Design a protein with these regions (language model features):
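Alpha-helix N-cap/helix-initiation sites
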Residues: 24-27, 31, 47-48, 62, ...
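Short recognition helix of helix-turn-helix/winged-helix DNA-binding domains
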Residues: 1-43
């Protein structure tokens, strides 16, 4: 890891029982929008994004699509104000998972460095 902070994870664990229970009322299009937004947020390290960004992420070209995106944002994401009163969306569970994994891998990395250092001293 060479001093680099771990913050990019290529896989997102999907808790299928929770996901299915929380999305059973959505249309297939809305489920796709939700998954697309979750995946985008995960690849960006769970960083917040604007409503306009969400429309672009979901490739909206109609008011109907924008309405579906906003429905998903409003139901599953949290709107927060940031610098200059810019409002952005976050997903609480994604942020928690990202923080958990970052801490977990940082701890493993530190333990590995200690183990490697101990082995190198024993070899000499």
């Amino acid at each position: 890891m060479d001093g680099k902070e771990i913050n990019k994870f290529h896989a997102l664990q999907l808790f299928t029982d929770t996901f299915a229970a929380e999305t059973v009322h959505l249309t297939n299009e809305q489920v796709g929008i939700y998954i697309r937004l979750l995946c985008f947020a995960w690849t960006k390290n769970a960083k917040p994004f604007t409503t306009e960004s969400a429309y672009r992420i979901c490739q909206c070209q109609s008011k109907e699509c924008e309405g579906n995106v906003y429905k998903i944002l409003d139901e599953f994401f949290k709107l927060e104000s940031f610098l200059n009163n810019i409002e952005k969306w976050t997903h609480k569970r994604l942020v928690q998972e990202h923080e958990y994994l970052t801490a977990k891998y940082k701890k493993r990395s530190e333990a590995g460095k200690k183990g490697g250092l101990a082995r190198s001293k024993n070899v000499a």
